[in-house]
A protein has these predicted regions:
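Phosphate-ester processing/binding pockets and catalytic centers
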Residues: 1-192
């Protein structure tokens, strides 16, 4: 069994340091955290880069064809492509099961529809010989999702604002960064 990111214990310890210092912090969320908290969390992540692998899929939703922009198509397809790539590199032959944990689907009235679409997409894209489960947990409940949030924020800042300050700190863990933008996006996404 392969457990996730060992830095989770250090994040838990830091969270308790903040609580003991009188800071009422429930969870880490990069965009909302104060600068000093954000910098410290990036320090903790950077100290454990050898223990993690980051794969990114960068896409502009507005550039894909209209039928793929619907949430029930876009997110399942993107997650499927990303997982297919990651699993082709990471999956060991002795793995009995793949457990995928994503952040909760924020669209309350569409949550069930999107979750079902994600399962259908993964069934088509993942190895038929492996059993898998996909769970949608609140990022508040899982330090691994909070680390993913920090990494995604750093990638977003790099692409959206040209600010690589935090990305530069985590890039050694970057195994792949796929860019599905504009015309290339349409060609790749419209293939079945």
């Amino acid at each position: 069994m392969r457990r996730p990111f060992p830095a989770l214990r250090t994040l838990d310890s830091y969270k308790h340091d903040l609580l003991e210092a009188g800071r009422n912090i429930e969870y880490f969320h990069c965009a909302h955290d104060r600068r000093e908290v954000r910098n410290r969390v990036f320090d903790l992540i950077a100290a454990h880069l050898n223990d993690m692998r980051m794969d990114c899929l960068v896409t502009e939703k507005s550039t894909v064809s209209a039928n793929l922009r619907r949430d029930t198509h876009f997110y399942p397809r993107m997650l499927g492509y990303l997982l297919k790539h990651i699993l082709s590199k990471e999956l060991t032959t002795d793995a009995k099961e793949i457990i995928v944990i994503t952040d909760s689907i924020p669209l309350h009235n569409r949550r069930h529809v999107i979750a079902k679409a994600v399962k259908r997409a993964l069934t088509k894209m993942l190895p038929k010989t492996k059993k898998y489960r996909i769970m949608h947990h609140s990022s508040r409940s899982h330090f691994g999702l909070q680390v993913a949030d920090y990494c995604c924020w750093a990638v977003f800042r790099k692409w959206e604002q040209g600010d690589t300050t935090h990305f530069d700190r985590i890039w050694p863990s970057l195994a792949s960064e796929h860019q599905m933008l504009r015309k290339a996006t349409r060609r790749m996404l419209n293939k079945k």
